Amino acid sequence: MNAKPAKELLLQLGQCSPQDTGQWTGAYKLPPELFEYYREVGPDDIYIEIGAETCTIPSLAKLENQQVGYRVHPRTTERFSNWPGHWIVVASIEASPMIYCDGAVFYAKARKGEWMLNKLFDNIYFMAASLATIGLFFRKWVEVFDENYNLKSEHCEQLTNDLTELFDSKAKAELVVANLGF
């Protein structure tokens, strides 16, 4: 997966524009791949409705703010000792972060205690394209949840099929669907 299909999918849900390194406000160095992603895809603070939750994909200018509560304490801005320096939150679904780490993107369900990461995407472009695909799925379908607010089986199957097309792998699609709680 590269920038072009990821950007095309995101553009159906929000705005994208090239963003340069000068828009990064953080005190630490970002990996070159993230600058490339923001230059080529350039999500402009995209909010994606995923069922009852909202996924946030920040612009480069707001990426540092996305680290608050994970990397640093929200009031004191003191660095959390249990958050490795090479983890960068590049998106979130409510309070659950998508973490860029060594080229891949991991998902960690928000909870107390140690972070338990699950690798969901081989690169940030797959993450962007997948989140857009999921957002487009929820935009297309109504009444997708049962009375217990679980995704109905036929819709879960459709979402898995949509992601299978993207990944060219049903196993990867099922992994994403399961980890995101569908």
PLM regions: where:
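Acidic, proline/glycine-rich low-complexity IDRs
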Residues: 139-182
